[in-house]
Amino acid sequence: MSRSKRDNNFYSVEIGDSTFTVLKRYQNLKPIGSGAQGIVCAAYDAILERNVAIKKLSRPFQNQTHAKRAYRELVLMKCVNHKNIIGLLNVFTPQKSLEEFQDVYIVMELMDANLCQVIQMELDHERMSYLLYQMLCGIKHLHSAGIIHRDLKPSNIVVKSDCTLKILDFGLARTAGTSFMMTPYVVTRYYRAPEVILGMGYKENVDLWSVGCIMGEMVCHKILFPGRDYIDQWNKVIEQLGTPCPEFMKKLQPTVRTYVENRPKYAGYSFEKLFPDVLFPADSEHNKLKASQARDLLSKMLVIDASKRISVDEALQHPYINVWYDPSEAEAPPPKIPDKQLDEREHTIEEWKELIYKEVMDLEERTKNGVIRGQPSPLAQVQQ
């Protein structure tokens, strides 16, 4: 595309303290959220004749961590296509060359709210179990591609008014380190599993702890473990669930183990005490049964020792969830990730920038009428 023609395709609009320079097809931009990764606007796509969400990545080349995360997100969004993972519609940059390249805009399906808003509502068992079922389907699909999220939280899960749910991002790269001792809180970590905050090894069911925290918050309308830092969070976990057994302590790194073993010992509370009947809809025998099933599922997800925690497959077959089971959703074919070493890659910022630029150019080339060619369209799901 020539320089002048490219210039003519874009216009700029001020959104808070940021300038969005977007393709002219995207009109009526309105800010709907912001986070560590960038600012998100709702917009109207005049070509697709539908509302979309546009995310401007925040300083993608500020450092190697930002650049790696931007590259990982683009590669994975391009490959993953599942009804419970947010759909990629378009990617673009207003800059005209690698030398000028500094902004990345990602266009996605627009949803109605994130789970933070839904958590404040009184949900019946049908809605709660359906939301959890969809969460588990999305997580299982990521796991099938070798993607373990590790950072699920209400703010990165979105819903529509018809109760459909989608996961917004792909979590922490496998190489993203975490440190237990005095780690400052840069982002919300209330939903991260004990094995993450204690710097242990982890497997897929690390994400089931996060689902348990989210489900518990749906029931109680409050954050279960709102720690000020990792140490405070660990204390809140053991105060409620009890100090884990010596067998668990043996798995910890020596410095962490010394600290954890020297904490006061807690017996913890029963799940009947933590999640009493009064918190659930229980106005019929059916609802009383459902409350019992919900509590049982919570007790299997909120287990400190990951070796004793439920797996995503077991959760999908749990009586509280399996009423929704559909093989086309829960057993969808795994996405093909071309770069198997995605999380292990290390580059300079300039090398990351070039890799990201190539991805954006490739996606621009593959985009026709706003939908990425070479993968099933998320629009097909919207129109079903």
UniProtKB/Swiss-Prot annotation:
Gene encoding the protein: Mapk8
Motif TXY, residue range(s) on this chain: 183-185
Post-translational modification remark: Phosphorylated by TAOK2. Dually phosphorylated on Thr-183 and Tyr-185 by MAP2K7 and MAP2K4, which activates the enzyme. May be phosphorylated at Thr-183 and Tyr-185 by MAP3K1/MEKK1. Phosphorylated form is more concentrated at synapses than none-phosphorylated.
Gene3D superfamilies, A to Z: Phosphorylase Kinase, domain 1 (3.30.200.20), Transferase(Phosphotransferase) domain 1 (1.10.510.10)
Protein name: Mitogen-activated protein kinase 8
InterPro entries: Kinase-like_dom_sf, MAP_kinase, MAP_kinase_CS, MAPK_JNK, Prot_kinase_dom, Ser/Thr_kinase_AS
Sites of Phosphotyrosine modification: Y185
GO molecular function, one term: ATP binding
Regulation: Inhibited by SERPINB3. Activated by threonine and tyrosine phosphorylation by either of two dual specificity kinases, MAP2K4 and MAP2K7. Inhibited by dual specificity phosphatases, such as DUSP1.
Quaternary context: Binds to at least four scaffolding proteins, MAPK8IP1/JIP-1, MAPK8IP2/JIP-2, MAPK8IP3/JIP-3/JSAP1 and SPAG9/MAPK8IP4/JIP-4. These proteins also bind other components of the JNK signaling pathway. Forms a complex with MAPK8IP1 and ARHGEF28. Interacts with TP53 and WWOX. Interacts with JAMP. Interacts with NFATC4. Interacts with MECOM; regulates JNK signaling. Interacts with PIN1; this interaction mediates MAPK8 conformational changes leading to the binding of MAPK8 to its substrates.
Positions annotated as active site in the UniProt record: D151
Disruption phenotype: At 14.5 dpc, brain intermediate zone and cortical plate are significantly thicker in mutant mice compared to wild type. The number of neuronal cells is increased in the cortical plate and intermediate zone. Cell cycle exit is decreased by 13% in the ventricular and subventricular zones. In 17.5 dpc brains, the ventricular zone was thinner in mutant mice compared to wild type animals, consistent with the increased number of neurons in the cortical plate. TUBB3 is consistently more diffuse and less structured in mutant telencephalon than in wild type.
EC number of the protein: 2.7.11.24
Species in which this protein is naturally found: Mus musculus (Mouse)
Localization: Cytoplasm; Nucleus; Synapse
